[in-house]
């Protein structure tokens, strides 16, 4: 798996987690669901989307899985 493919999969995972979080409001959920669909279905991807995913995940309660995901995204973004 290439670095880009790995980052893309982490972004999709981060967006999915952010959508399901209780702290994410309705408008954010709709936006994040749309972005996740675009990334996964149409292979639309950019570093800005990865940074946005990291931003939303950073706002969530820190569980072990969230901490690992944040670290992975930060490492892959450089």
Q: What residue spans do the PLM features occupy?
A:
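Short terminal alpha-helical segments
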Residues: 1-28, 70-73, 77
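Short, intrinsically disordered, low-complexity terminal segments
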Residues: 11, 15-18, 33, 47-50
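Alpha-helix N-cap/helix-initiation sites
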Residues: 24-30, 43-47
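Short, charged early-sequence alpha-helical segments and their helix-coil boundaries
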Residues: 41-72
